[in-house]
Amino acid sequence: MMKIVFYGANAATFEPGLSAQLDMPHEITVISDAVDGAGEAEALAGADVVVGVHYNGKGVQAARLFQLPAAGYDKVDMDALPDGCAVCNAFGHENAIAEYVMTALLSRHVPLADADTRLRRGDWHYWAGGPDGLRTELGQQSIGIVGHGHIGKAVKDRALAFGMAVHVANRSPVADSRVTAHGLDGLTDMMGQVDFVLNTLPLTDTTASLIGAAELGAMRDGAVVMNVGRGPVIDEDALFAAVKDGRLGAILDTWYVYPSAETPNPMPSKHSFHTLPNVMITPHMSGWTTGTIARRTATVAENVNRLARGEDLINVIKAPKP
């Protein structure tokens, strides 16, 4: 009997539909983030598989797999897991995030909401033939994508389809003749050449504050920085300094402060990004679609089935110690 525990509210989102995709006898338990309900600590301790997005080092004892139903793993203390426990993540969010990015980019060029609001009061500001509403086209713009993983590749393909000039900065070489490729050591140079800079990188020891004052300072006046990776990849203080006077714009979906049990609805930063008209802010929603949930649930099922059959797991972040 495979004992599977969904640890916390976020993880529980991926439980419906899992059972039908599993090939072995199993028992599924959903527990709270606080692990304070009746029998929850015992369930966590005895689980063969834990599905969760965070782990502080307490409670997991027998697990052979800690499966993240998400890409980011910066909230998981992997060293505190049992030696025989593998850690794997899941993707499947790249289509959703790419749609978010393109929607955000298009919204800066095609002001549908403002045009609708104005015309409802008889204001023809954007009418064809009028000089005030003349706008640029997305295909006249350039974008620099930081990271060439699942998200970066999905955005790249869509940006190219719109006719944008695409640059990519990545740790390893980018073999795509359609784009201008840069190493991460050339990040500052790339950021000075484009109209939009998009971060897609996860948060690791090497990516924290990768984009700081020097990199932001190299950007053109009026350029826009976007973040759908992890918030702290872009230095919080440097970013606010770069946008508060209006020189740069920003579209921010990932943050520095998140809801907690103690503060369920915090502002997303110590700085007042929310007061700036040149900054668009959203609550880490870019990848949250029914398609993402379905694809990630399928990944969880695939790894549980592989574990039961003794096969190699997919998306391994940390292999079990022998």
List the model feature ranges, each with a label.
Residues 172-270:
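Rossmann-like adenosine-cofactor binding region
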Residues 1-49:
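N-terminal glycine-/charge-rich "phosphate-binding" loop or analogous flexible N-terminal tail
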Residues 33-45, 54-59, 177-194:
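Short acidic low-complexity segments
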Residues 45-121, 135:
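Phosphate/diphosphate ligand-binding glycine-rich loop within oxidoreductases
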Residues 222, 230-322:
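Rossmann-like dinucleotide-binding domain for NAD(H)/NADP(H)
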Residues 43-44, 60, 138, 188-192, ...:
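A short, aliphatic-rich alpha-helical micro-motif
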Residues 116-154:
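Glycine-rich NAD(P)-binding loop of Rossmann-like domains
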Residues 167:
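Conserved beta-strand positions in the Rossmann-like core of class I SAM-dependent methyltransferases
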